[in-house]
Amino acid sequence: MIQVANAPCSWGVIENVEGERGGYARVLDEMQEAGYAGTELGDWGFMPTDPRALRRELERRKLKLLASWVTVHLHDPARLPANEADVLRTARQLAEVGGPDNLVVLGNDPYTDPLRTLAAGRILPDHGMSEAQWRTVTDGANRLARTVKRETGLRTVFHHHIGTWVETPEETARFLAMTDPEVLGLCFDTGHYSFGGGNPVEGVRRHADRIWHVHFKDHDPKVAARSRRDGWNAVKSIEQGVFCELGNGDVDF
C-alpha cells in the first residue's frame, strides 16, 4: 500500500516566506485528520527539538517522521562548516525520532541569487555555473552527505529547485553525475522539474536509480506562460499559483 506524507511547508511554514504561521500542534492535527501517514520535520525549531517530546507528539497522532529539508549554501565554501553543523543537528534528530530510513534533504538556499531568482522557469545555458563553481557545489554536497552517513547512518538527498543554481533537467542531471551515488540521491520534485523545463514522467524514468524521495507538486502551465511572458521572478510565480493544487495542473500523476 502506498502511503503519503506531508510537510509543514504546506501550511506556510517555510523559510523565505512571510505570513502567519500556525502552531505545530495544529499542523500535525490537520495532517492526522486528512489521513496522512507522516510528516517532514519542517524548519528547525517549528516542532519540538527535544526528541522525546517530538516522538510523543507524533506517536499520539500515529504519524511517522521521514525527512527534513535543511537549507545549505553549497556555492559558498566559507559557509560549509556551519552548514555541516546544521545538517548534523537535523540528521541526529531524524535518526533518533524517525529511525534509519529517514532522509536529510539538502536545499541550496533559494532566491538568493538575483539572476537565478529573476530567470526562474526560463533559465538559459549562459545563466549556469562555471566549471569551478560546479566542482565547489558538488564537492560540498558530497562532503555533507558523507558526514551524515558517517555520523548517523542516514542517507541524504538533494532537492533541485527553481531560483537556485540547480533548476533545469540538464543541471539536475549534471549534479547527479558529479555526486556520489552511494551516499547522495535525489529528492525529485514534480512541480519544480516541470517549471524548470522538464517532463516529470521522463525525469522519473531518467533518474529512477537516484530518486530516494519525492515531493508531489503540480504545475499550472498557464501561470508558467504568464511568468515567462511578463518576466516574473520565482517568488512572484509561486505567489501567483504556478504550483497549483494537485490535479489542477499538467503533471501526470
Model-derived segments and spans:
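Short, flexible, mixed-charge acidic loops at enzyme active sites
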Residues: 18-23, 111-122, 224-236
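Active-site acidic/histidine proton-transfer and metal-coordination neighborhood
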Residues: 64, 79-186
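Short amphipathic alpha-helical interaction segments
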Residues: 244-252
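Short glycine/serine/threonine-enriched helix-capping/active-site loop
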Residues: 68, 106-107, 214
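N-terminal pre-domain/capping segments
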Residues: 1-100, 134-136, 142-143, 150, ...
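Active-site-proximal loop/turn and secondary-structure-junction residues that shape catalytic pockets
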Residues: 10-12, 43-45, 71-74, 108-112, ...
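Loop/helix-junction capping segments adjacent to catalytic residues or to phosphate/diphosphate-binding pockets
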Residues: 48, 77, 165-166, 194-197, ...
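Acidic/histidine-rich catalytic cores of soluble enzymes
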Residues: 6, 38-39, 138-244
